[in-house]
Design a protein with these regions (language model features):
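Catalytic-core regions of core metabolic enzymes
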Residues: 1-258
Length: 258
């Protein structure tokens, strides 16, 4: 189906594995295929038998066949939903190089550790042009790197200008494949409009832009209600955009191998 751009599914057993993987190898050349497999443990397999009366394959054998066919396997149900949410409005990332706009140094450290230890993502050095643009909105004593700690710029420029300039600079950097911004939203820090995020995402349509929030739940809900209908996915936990990007980067790599 040419109108189907990605396939995400849950599976407990395979009755015709040869046919399944033959089709999978053909499909994964053109579009991402993401699998959540149930019954991978003895307890899970027993539960699968009890409600489907079917037997699953040996999980290690299945895992190897899945990788060889170009399917990307995940292990959390929430990731299936979040990956679908990210794929629907945004392109796949071209690679694993992420530009991150962080609202604090603590978030930057925590998420750098997460990406290094649990994903294939990297935060590459920024180009001199990108650094110069971001420095122009920051107090002079601030050291700029990737991840970008944007809070000092927010204190002098306000939320909208600081995030707009930082996100735009990262999207224009040829060494960046995707941009994640985490925003701390309160009544004092909420921008007048989120149009700038929608506009930047549309202008740089070939790079995904993901937004996550930390702060007042009512302010977060307003931002989500504005951004998502306009094609910018948002994520409830600050770790989620990076976990999703890891999945989608693996999808891109699998498509290239296929």
């Amino acid at each position: 189906d040419d109108a189907t751009e990605a396939i995400l599914f849950y599976l407990e057993s395979l009755k015709r594995p040869s046919k399944f993987f033959k089709i999978a190898r053909r499909v994964t050349r053109k579009k991402p295929v993401i699998l959540l497999k149930g019954g991978s443990t003895a307890d899970g397999a027993s539960a699968a038998v009890s409600h489907t009366a079917s037997l699953g394959s040996d999980d290690r054998i299945l895992d190897g066949a899945v990788r060889q066919s170009g399917i990307v396997r995940i292990h959390e149900f929430s990731h299936l939903v979040l990956a679908a949410k990210a794929i629907a409005p945004m392109p796949l990332p071209a690679g694993n190089k992420v530009g991150f706009v962080s609202p604090s140094g603590a978030f930057a450290v925590h998420l750098s550790d997460l990406c290094r230890e649990r994903t294939c993502l990297i935060f590459p050095p920024l180009s001199e042009r990108t650094l110069k643009r971001i420095r122009s909105i920051c107090p002079p004593f601030i050291n700029i790197a990737n991840p970008v700690d944007i809070f000092p710029a927010v204190t002098v420029q306000g939320t909208e200008i600081a995030y707009r300039e930082a996100i735009a600079a990262l999207l224009e950097d040829p060494g960046i494949d995707a941009v994640v911004a985490v925003m701390i939203l309160t009544e004092e820090l909420t921008p007048d409009s989120y149009d700038f995020i929608v506009d930047l995402a549309a202008r740089h349509w070939n790079k995904p832009v993901y937004i996550s929030f930390s702060g007042d739940s009512a302010c977060n809900a307003v931002a989500k209600a504005f951004l998502e209908p306009r094609g910018v996915p948002t994520f409830p936990l600050i770790e989620d955009p990076f976990k999703v990007l890891d999945i989608l980067v693996r999808c891109r790599a699998a498509m290239k191998r296929s």
